[in-house]
Amino acid sequence: MKLNQKEQRFLRMFPPRMKQLENQIRLVKNCSRKDGYEWGFTDLVPNFFIVIFKDLTLCAKNFGLDIDVTIGGRDIEDIYDDALEKFNEYNAD
């Protein structure tokens, strides 16, 4: 089967971008090592994950995937706005 131009472009772009994402997740995971980092003093971690999970669920939806995310038993939709506000405060220029 011969792929059209859009299909070829997708196969050229999507896998490497997902590999980059996987790499970035691995780097973030390294920050969880308790021998090198301390994060228990801040709510930064849950707020950042809430924002990222929301972005990932919206991205997945664009590909036709329906993903439900809960954090501590709470639906991400219920806690996203507060988390985004804190995320933006930390990332303000």
Model-derived features: positions:
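N-terminal intrinsically disordered, cationic/polar leader segments
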Residues: 1-34, 38, 46-93
